[in-house]
Amino acid sequence: EICACLVGSEMCIRDSKSLTFNPFTKIGSEWMLITAGDQSGYNTMTASWGGLGVLWGKNVATCYIRPQRYTKKFVDANDTFTLSFYGPEHKQALSICGSKSGRDCDKVKEAGLTPYFVDGTAAFEEADMVFVCKKLYEDEIRPENFIAKENDEKWYPEKDYHTVYIAEITKVLVRE
């Protein structure tokens, strides 16, 4: 097992095979932050849709971003982004990051999060776990491809279909 701590940090690099958590709970109930950008500018958003798995021989994360989300422009402009996971004490911070736009306010400051940069990509010191992700593929959800048509009606009344991003998890950081 690989474990190397980052200098000046409580975060250690872990082998992804050593992870032991339920992704359905971690993403769907506890939520995650999708963050992209660098020191010159970044943004973050809360997400409760996503997935983890293996594709093309790589450990991957899948995330979904609607076109109107400010974070999307940062994800689109960069090759990498981070997914970060938090304990219950940070639920309010994730609520702020999910309900306010970085276009209109400094929601990172308002949420009490402290940015740092790993491999040139923004993440937050308060996270218990961070995945550094390198984009491999993206596509738009298309209405004509719904087999279960009720999902189109239920989740897309405004027809603001998500972009799907599949990204290789290149680094896993875990709070020690």
Predicted regions and their residues:
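Active-site-proximal mixed secondary-structure blocks
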Residues: 14-47, 51-176
